[in-house]
Amino acid sequence: MTEDHAVVRSDGGLSRRSFAAVAGTATVATALTSGVAAALPAPAASGDSRGADFDRCLAVARALLVLDSDDRPLVPRYQSVLQKGLPAQRRTRPKNVLVIGAGPAGLVAAWLLKRAGHRVTVLEANGNRAGGRVKTFRSGGHERAEQPFADPRQYAEAGAMRIPGSHPLVMELIDQFELKKRRFHYVDVDSEGRPANRTWIHVNGIRVRRADYARAPRRVNRSFGVPRAHWDTPAAAILRSVLDPVRDEFSRVGRDGKRVDKPLPERLQGWARVVQRFGDWSMFRFLTEHAGLDERTIDLIGTLENLTSRLPLSFIHSFIGSSLISPDTPFYELEGGTAVLPDALLERVRKDVRFDRRVTRIQYHHPDRPSPDVEQVRSKGPHVWVDTVSEGRDGPVVREQFTADVAVVTVPFSGLRHVQIAPPLSYGKRRAVCELHYDSATKVLLEFSRRWWEFDEADWKRELRAVDPGLYDAYRTGRAAADGSLLGAHPSVPAGHITAGQRTHYAANRAVARDQPEAVDVVGGGSVSDNANRFMFHPSHPVPGSAGGVVLASYSWADDALRWDSLDDEARYPHALCGLQQVYGQRIEVFYTGAGRTQSWLRDPYAYGEASVLLPGQHTELLSAIPVAEGPLHFAGDHTSVKPAWIEGAVESAVRAALEIHTA
């Protein structure tokens, strides 16, 4: 799951997307600025006739706060289910259960139901891998993957890469399975582990450290043509100033200057008012009509705070993502890659998983929906019938049918659109399947034989002189060879991974620049640019036994991602390296091993997109129908929660669906 949207928290915290803007800007800006000369929005009024009816808005608020219909928190109960299993007393006999999809939601639901004594079969379209959008490029694993990088010890994330400490259900699974976690540095740190904010902002031909921009933003801001009132205010502070009045509906600023949630009843009502007021607004409309920001200032915020690609999409979607995680929340990564979590889940249900079984048809029994197209199910059972087909990659194409009493459908709605279901689902569900908006996200990862982002200038001198005694000065003066001969030239780069064709393509795409910026000298964190790469991230930790590392050279969403999706995989790597060089300088080329990996979630035949990223109005128009069972069909997956793209949303939905089946 691609972590995941779009805005830096108004109080300096991080949404799923704001790590892409890298909180260094917001964090430093918060300490250095106290306000902004901007048109501040009015409080989110509850009686706006343009909004959705208040009951629907309350339903959305309950979903995002994870409350039941009596406004009681559900998370403690869900945690107890993960710890102790489903309730011991069942109302009916054990059921035959089909789980469609072996992502986190499907695996958790299958594990819980199996522990409770139900007979479970999991159907997964992928021929060899479970985990859905939790995917690690690695050697081996349960999928027995081939070595992805020149160094067999290296691995990198194609999807989910960090886990908030405030996601209790995922943290419960990590602790229960005894997986090793460590801090994920979304803000770069120095060698002592202190926030450094030394990574780069590279926009409009200007390159500046994040900390320097937070202290003196005028040069960058003026390059966007923003009004004089915004010359000396960092982008994060401008954004914070227009979002804070909305957050006042459900939280307040404490004496220590930090946001504190209001009591639950007030919080619920406040969120409902926000949904009613802005539920059918896009982020662009909010920033222009409500916040009164001009186009140039929105360009500044969009570029530095990763809002550009999300401006046409739902304000509520972005605002929820920015508000459910405290600014003090630590983030973690899993040693060995995030895929160790689905590894652990798969171990518990492996014998029940059928890989290479793509579901093409579903029939289900519903007494109120008679249909002449339903031939395989009946009132006395089976209640669910599923037709599948294999992809035939390792043998002949085969069809296989499965029956059950109930099913858990975790397929993304973008993929469920291609599954024939009889009788037809309810109108609300069919509308959600047809209309729920999924976005694109693409990563391009490049392997280097040395962790050059951790170098100081003395390190650069030493390493470049190992290639040629005069090479350090040649790069500094723009005299280094530009014909591709220096690609992977360092002695640490394994031979045999860079072809003559790669050198030619690289030389044709090589960044043309004579200046060489100073060493980054950081651990973790990342940089932002207005070039095609947009956001770049360094590993937070070295891989034991390896002197190199894999850089997330480009992480992009929406239209930015589509620019990469048009390129073949191999064609992306020289472009991504060029974008890195525009930010970090040409000399990084000597450590490039020639190995890269890329993931387009929109082009993925199992994911059908990054995640559900809702359009204006879809929270109130579609959300209520998405998680509701249709007879014996139950629905789970992060798209059925108000935490799309987060593993927490998938686990939350899995526990809900398992309880529905077990207690029916």
Swiss-Prot record:
Q: Name one Pfam family in it.
A: Amino_oxidase
Q: Which residues form the signal peptide?
A: 1-44
Q: Which UniProt keywords apply?
A: FAD, Flavoprotein, Nucleotide-binding, Oxidoreductase, Secreted, Signal, Zymogen
**Class of the enzyme per the UniProt entry, highest EC level:** oxidoreductase
Cofactors named for this entry: FAD
Positions that bind FAD: 105, 124-125, 133, 161-162, 638, 646-647
Which SUPFAM superfamilies does this chain map to? FAD-linked reductases, C-terminal domain, FAD/NAD(P)-binding domain
Question: Where is this protein found?
Answer: Secreted
One MF annotation (Gene Ontology) recorded for this entry: nucleotide binding
| InterPro entries, alphabetized | Amino_oxidase, FAD/NAD-bd_sf, Flavin_monoamine_oxidase, TAT_signal
> What top-level branch of life does the organism fall under?
Bacteria
Q: State the reactions this protein catalyses.
A: L-glutamate + O2 + H2O = H2O2 + 2-oxoglutarate + NH4(+)
How is the activity of this protein regulated? Activity is stimulated in the presence of Mn(2+), Ca(2+) or Mg(2+).
Q: How is it modified after translation?
A: Predicted to be exported by the Tat system. The position of the signal peptide cleavage has not been experimentally proven. The precursor form is proteolytically cleaved by an endopeptidase into alpha, beta and gamma chains, which form the stable mature enzyme.
Q: What does this protein do?
A: Catalyzes the oxidative deamination of L-glutamate to 2-ketoglutarate along with the production of ammonia and hydrogen peroxide.
Q: Which family does it belong to?
A: Belongs to the flavin monoamine oxidase family. LGOX subfamily.
What is its quaternary makeup?
The mature enzyme is a heterohexamer composed of 2 alpha chains, 2 beta chains and 2 gamma chains (alpha2beta2gamma2).
Return the protein name. Answer: L-glutamate oxidase precursor
Q: What is the lineage of its organism?
A: Bacteria, Bacillati, Actinomycetota, Actinomycetes, Kitasatosporales
- What is the primary gene name for this protein? lgoX
